[in-house]
Amino acid sequence: MKIRVMLVDDEPFILQGLSMPIDWEKVHCEIVKTAANGKEAYEYLKENRVDLILADIEMPEMTGLELLEKIREEKISDAYFAILSGYNDFSYAQRAIHSSCIEYILKPVSRDSLIALIRKVTKKKELTDQEEQKRKKLQRIYLIRNLAS
């Protein structure tokens, strides 16, 4: 299982820095998209599926929190979402958590916090995938039984 990751930040050096501290392939991840702001990320998400979004909180055009709220409200993506922030203000973290943010990571982002996030997402995704497989199996059994009777 490979985790499809999108990185969203208006600072190119941050995007580059996020892709360097770990070997994404080794942790079974693939960076499928980098976006310079929430609006660009939103447009990508309307047409493409990702498993994890790491987004800066403060960006022009659309902030990370606005992106998170919009994709949840419009049911565009159920990807796991982590906010990257230079602010340790509780109100930002509270708003992010209210919108189903899986993690609120303070900048500068450490290698350890990225690896911990990836492990967390991998475990959650495995459980979700298993639940989905069980649901589909039960659906098939139900259909077969009803067709046979």
Predicted regions and their residues:
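Active-site residues of response regulator receiver
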Residues: D9, D56
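Acidic, metal-coordinating helix/loop segments flanking the phosphotransfer/catalytic sites
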Residues: T34-L52
